Amino acid sequence: MKKIEAIIKPFKLDEVREALSEVGVTGLTVTEVKGFGRQKGHTELYRGAEYVVDFLPKVKIEAAVPDELVERTIEAIVKAARTGKIGDGK
């Protein structure tokens, strides 16, 4: 049994969940998180002042899977979550 964690873009959650279901993952924990990396944040205007928002909203998924499902689970997450743009991760 292995615990797999991935941080993905929020709009990819449904696709990842469906892909994991197809490979046999039956349980998943989802947490809303914020993070930053090479992908830069954005500026927002609040009460007439500009603020830089460095942390971007992400979703962390966690799943405990049997050893025989580890590779298929990772492949399913990567394939479903990838957008081809900055912020995809490694």
Which residues does each predicted region cover?
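Positively charged, small/polar-rich N-terminal and surface patches that mediate targeting and assembly
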Residues: 1-90
